[in-house]
Amino acid sequence: MVEIFNYSTSIYEQHASNNRIVSDFRKEIQMEGISIRDVAKHAQILDMNPKPSALTSLLQTNQKSHWACFSPPNNFYKQRFSTPYLAPSLGSPDQQDEDIEKISSFLKVLTRGKFSYRSQITPFLSYKDKEEEEDEDPEEDDDDPRVQQGKVLLKALDLGVKSTNVMIDYVISRIFQFVQG
């Protein structure tokens, strides 16, 4: 281990010249010794980029891997952003009506003609009217789970998908009216 008093004189001379340069610089910019420490605080550069947390870095959930190893089909990026239907894969409204009829006829066969279903879609039915209709239709308790599932499916198709499609159609028609002037 080298101790301080074992250095050569050239080291002491270099240290003295460095101190002289620093003191000359302080005099040149007229800065006191205490305020030099404050320069570092003002010269800080804040990194405003968001950094992942330690858990995110550990689990690497911030790393995106491309799962599709094939190119998109032709005209994929030219497709329309939205469709006039909530779920285009369910078909047109006519096809949905046919599906509802098939399900209701199947449930009618299961219940030996006791089951009947009518569409509850009206474009602008108020909330009070819906409450009155619910009070009028007493729910019968059927033991068959297929009938219960069929009722739930019919309500989902009718009140969920079809009513949303009616609303989407209304909004699109109002947009076209607005665009036309």
Curated annotation (Swiss-Prot):
Biased composition range(s): Acidic residues: 131-144
InterPro entries according to UniProt: DUF5399
Superkingdom classification of source: Bacteria
Region Disordered, residue ranges: 126-148
Family statement drawn from the similarity comment of this UniProt entry: Belongs to the chlamydial CPn_0422/CT_273/TC_0545 family.
Protein name: Uncharacterized protein CPn_0422/CP_0331/CPj0422/CpB0438
Organism: Chlamydia pneumoniae (Chlamydophila pneumoniae)
